[in-house]
């Protein structure tokens, strides 16, 4: 490991302490203003060259070696807003798309995902499926009239509609 990661970690820590922590109460409100504030923090992280540090360089990330990134990410993990503000929230999804997606899906989603223009989401807990293996998922999606309808399986005993 190089010693450069310690400087990067210190810069990230300062960014979180000076830019994110003071704004957490406002960010937590989920208002249009707080979303705009988060967008400004994302841009500031890009300007400061501390955006998406663990992402490979060929997809627009910082290319930081994994073990060095672990120490930086420990600081990032202290604030749920820091993960988004610093572009680390999409690392696993970005690598998955980079490695396994068809060129069409990579071209459509990878760059916007790494740049923070779109956000990943993945749900995996289902009844009758005791597994962390996504190939075991039973939820389906059906395209109806140009709109995807997700057919969910609920774990709650309360009655509810099975489609969203």
What does each of the following model-derived ranges do?
Residues 139-141:
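A structural signal for short hydrophobic beta-strand segments in well-ordered beta-sheet cores
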Residues 58, 125-129:
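Short, solvent-exposed loop/turn elements at beta->coil junctions and helix N-caps
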Residues 1-87, 104-115:
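Amphipathic, small/basic residue-rich leader segments at the start of a protein or domain
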Residues 85-104, 133:
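N-terminal glycine-rich flavin-associated loop
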Residues 117-125:
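A short, Trp-centered hydrophobic/proline-enriched beta-strand micro-motif
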Residues 154-161:
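Conserved small/polar residues in nucleotide/adenosyl-binding loops
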């Amino acid at each position: 490991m190089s010693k450069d990661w310690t400087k990067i970690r210190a810069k990230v820590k300062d960014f979180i302490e000076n830019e994110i922590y003071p704004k957490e109460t406002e960010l937590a409100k989920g208002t249009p203003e707080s979303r705009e504030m988060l967008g400004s923090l994302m841009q500031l992280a890009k300007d400061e060259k501390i955006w998406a540090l663990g992402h490979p360089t060929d997809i627009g990330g910082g290319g930081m070696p994994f073990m060095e990134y672990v120490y930086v990410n420990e600081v990032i993990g202290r604030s749920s807003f820091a993960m988004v503000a610093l572009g680390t929230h999409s690392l696993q999804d970005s690598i998955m798309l980079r490695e396994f997606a068809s060129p069409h899906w990579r071209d459509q989603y990878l760059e916007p995902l790494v740049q923070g223009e779109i956000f990943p989401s993945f749900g995996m807990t289902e009844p009758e499926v005791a597994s962390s293996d996504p190939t075991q998922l039973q939820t389906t999606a059906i395209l109806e009239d140009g709109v995807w309808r997700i057919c969910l399986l609920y774990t709650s005993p309360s009655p509810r509609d099975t489609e969203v």
